[in-house]
Regions:
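ABC-family P-loop ATPase nucleotide-binding domain
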Residues: 1-24, 236, 240-255
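H-loop (His-switch) and adjacent beta-strand-loop-beta switch element
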Residues: 226-239
């Protein structure tokens, strides 16, 4: 088993550090550990795919990184912030300002326009000035994901792939430290998934750090680093050259 990188790592200090991360859920049969002790470093500008079967711990780890849930034990350090020590109010503020989250199911507000959905995190964090200034930024972000022409439409008026682009723009609203994406292409057809994935690749090229949980082994083969999780433990940590050599492990994963 490997909880750290086997290959060369980017220069500089890690952006995200996980130390002994565990998460247990109480069940009638006793505590069930979804994460069993994760040690991990993620560096600025990396595009990391967390690959694993359903129930392996992917979403749990994403929720820990995004501040949606708390660990049972261990430490989470992101850009020098001890996330595991934050109060509930502090965690909510930190998450709203510093993390961009993209879910499989879009989670857009149906009665708000695409632009208004992108404005929500700005309003929550009290950033980017007056509503007209927030609207201008929302349009800029929608242009970044090539959907500005739909800014004033309701989510129901655009396609699934376009809704996911709106969700990505919303995740970028407060210029987050990193983006946590949980199966962001899981509900899309392959062509639309490729288009959404290309948006992520462009964001990484511009310097963003992305941590993406997926069961799509083909998409996972196109990132800068692949982690494989099984039964709450990271069992492989591969960078590009190693990922090619270790591809036989990836092809065993269930779609």
């Amino acid at each position: 088993m490997s909880n750290g990188s086997n290959g060369s790592r980017p220069p500089g200090e890690p952006l995200i550090v996980l130390e002994g991360l565990k998460k247990a859920y109480r069940t009638p049969a006793g505590d069930f550990y979804a994460l069993k002790g994760i040690d991990l470093e993620i560096y600025p500008g990396e595009f990391v795919a967390l690959l694993g079967r359903s129930g392996a711990g992917k979403s749990t780890l994403i929720n820990m990184l995004a501040g949606i849930d708390r660990p049972t034990a261990g430490e989470i350090w992101i850009a020098g912030q001890a996330v595991h020590k934050l109060s509930e109010a502090g965690l909510t503020r930190w998450r709203g300002r510093e993390v961009g989250v993209v879910f499989q199911s879009f989670q857009l507000m149906p009665m708000l326009t695409c632009a208004q959905n992108v404005m929500l995190p700005m309003d929550f964090a009290g950033r980017y000035g007056l509503p007209r200034q927030q609207y201008a930024r929302a349009r800029e972000l929608l242009a970044t994901v090539d959907i500005a022409e739909h800014a004033d439409k309701l989510p129901s008026a655009v396609s699934g792939g376009q809704r996911q682009r709106v969700a990505i723009a919303r995740a970028l609203a407060n210029d987050p430290i990193f983006i946590a994406a949980d199966e962001p292409t899981g509900s899309l057809d392959s062509r639309t998934a490729d288009a959404v994935f290309a948006v992520f690749q462009q964001l990484v090229a511009e310097g963003k750090t992305i941590f993406m949980a997926t069961h799509d082994r083909e998409l996972a083969s196109r990132v800068s680093r692949v982690l494989r999780i099984e039964d709450g433990l990271i069992v492989e940590d591969l960078r590009p050259a190693e990922a090619q050599e270790g591809r036989q492990h990836v092809v065993e994963m269930e779609a």
